[in-house]
Design a protein with these regions (language model features):
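Primarily recognizes the serine-hydrolase "nucleophile elbow" in alpha/beta-hydrolase
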Residues: 10, 18-65
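A short beta-to-alpha transition loop/helix N-cap that caps and shapes the active-site region
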Residues: 53-58, 79, 111-112
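Short beta-strand/loop motif that positions the catalytic acidic residue
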Residues: 70-73, 77
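Short, proline-enriched alpha-helix->beta-strand connector loops that line the catalytic pocket
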Residues: 17-18, 64-69, 95-98
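Short, hinge-like loop/turn segments at secondary-structure boundaries
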Residues: 62-66, 118-121
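C-terminal catalytic histidine-bearing segment of alpha/beta-hydrolase fold enzymes
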Residues: 83-134
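Alpha/beta-hydrolase active-site loop
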Residues: 1-12
Length: 134
């Protein structure tokens, strides 16, 4: 259902798949990774805040076609521990995926201003890179 919605919105706005970025918070991070890593063609980027990798099964078979990934997590997260992001980072990197990460000091299960700034800059860079290869 989510993939059909994404496809419909891209079509409605006459945008290529490379103009898609998925951003999620908590469970939304898990959804963004699950959908974004399986989409063909891949989105330009996935930004995940305070989440985790839902399952190793979502890792793509061809990491060369994977989106850029940024994971941001608070070191004081009481809902989804920081270890979940560290494990996700390790699994994504081991699968050959381009993953960047940031630990937000003193942040619980939320997003601070620095995390928003990093996410915005990451998306801007990913969209620029995707546009240059169209």
């Amino acid at each position: 259902v989510l993939e059909a919605l994404l496809d419909a919105e891209l079509k409605r706005h006459s945008l290529p798949a490379s103009a898609l970025g998925l951003v999620g918070f908590s469970q939304g991070t898990m959804m963004a990774l699950a959908v974004g890593l399986r989409r063909n063609p891949s989105p330009a980027a996935i930004v995940g805040y305070s989440g985790a990798l839902p399952a190793a099964e979502v890792l793509p078979k061809d990491p060369g076609k994977a989106p850029a990934i940024l994971l941001v997590h608070g070191d004081m997260d009481e809902v989804i521990p920081l270890d979940a992001m560290l494990i996700a980072r390790e699994q994504l990197a081991a699968a050959g995926l381009p993953v960047e990460w940031h630990i937000a000091q003193g942040v619980g299960h939320g997003i601070d201003g620095e995390g928003l700034r990093l996410g915005g800059a990451f998306l801007k860079q990913a969209f620029a890179a995707a546009a240059s290869v169209r």
